[in-house]
């Protein structure tokens, strides 16, 4: 009996260690692919080295992360398609002013739509996977661990933290655009010059807010990279 129990314990230990190995390998592959947001992630979540509940848990977690990454990257592709990175291009705005801002109106509408869609998809993924936990043929303790893990993942999700800042930037951009449409301005030396000092101050304040928000995003990104590099060295 002692020998049988010892063998079972050793098998469980070996399976646990293999689970860690597989998850580390797969997460590294996922991270590498996720950096290229121009195309969907295509990660094989299955691995023959795992069996039983280790296989189920691995595939469950990897599928959750893949769907989150793909939702985020699709959102980034939609921002690029909307030419969001050219919003404050002075030449573009000056040209668009002559067209009653048709391009900028569409740009902001497209970005708002993409943001709403991503927010909805993000919440849907989380709810779907919380429900899927109950379908896994694992013990009650493992289900509770997965529920806690998904809850902690959502709270610590740095991509979503960045998204919440991006929403603030969009709000600021809409305020800036309102000023551009409402008050006369002209282009001078690649700058936007309003005729009245009050509008200059308001526009500049909004622009400074955007710069600060972008700096926050960069800080989070650098922190993420440092944390991941630390994990890979361990």
Model-derived features: positions:
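Generic cytosolic/nucleocytoplasmic N-terminal low-complexity/intrinsically disordered segments
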Residues: 25-27, 131, 222
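Leu/Val/Ala/Ile-rich N-terminal alpha-helices, chiefly Sec-type signal peptides and the beginnings
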Residues: 2-104
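Extracytoplasmic/luminal low-complexity segments enriched in Pro/Gly and acidic/polar residues
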Residues: 168, 172-234
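Exposed alpha-helical structural elements
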Residues: 18, 56, 60, 74, ...
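Amphipathic alpha-helix face/heptad-repeat signature
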Residues: 57-60, 64, 107, 111-114, ...
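Extended amphipathic alpha-helical interaction segments
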Residues: 80-193
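Residue-identity detector for glutamine
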Residues: 5, 9-11, 17, 29, ...
């Amino acid at each position: 009996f002692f020998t049988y129990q010892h063998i079972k314990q050793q098998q469980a230990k070996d399976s646990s260690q293999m689970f860690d190995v597989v998850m580390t390998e797969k997460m590294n592959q996922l991270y590498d692919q996720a950096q290229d947001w121009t195309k969907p992630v295509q990660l094989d979540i299955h691995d023959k080295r795992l069996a039983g509940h280790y296989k189920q848990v691995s595939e469950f977690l990897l599928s959750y992360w893949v769907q989150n990454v793909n939702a985020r990257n699709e959102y980034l592709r939609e921002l690029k398609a909307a030419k969001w990175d050219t919003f404050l291009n002075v030449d573009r705005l000056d040209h668009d002013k002559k067209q009653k801002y048709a391009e900028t109106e569409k740009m902001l509408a497209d970005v708002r739509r993409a943001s709403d869609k991503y927010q909805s998809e993000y919440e849907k993924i989380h709810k779907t996977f919380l429900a899927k936990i109950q379908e896994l043929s694992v013990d009650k303790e493992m289900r509770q661990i997965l529920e806690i893990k998904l809850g902690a993942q959502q709270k610590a999700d740095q991509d979503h933290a960045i998204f919440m800042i991006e929403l603030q930037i969009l709000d600021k951009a809409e305020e800036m655009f309102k000023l551009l449409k409402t008050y006369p301005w002209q282009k001078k030396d690649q700058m936007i010059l309003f005729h009245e000092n009050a509008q200059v101050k308001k526009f500049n304040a909004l622009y400074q807010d955007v710069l600060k928000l972008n700096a926050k995003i960069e800080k989070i990104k650098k922190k993420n990279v440092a944390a991941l590099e630390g994990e890979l060295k361990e």
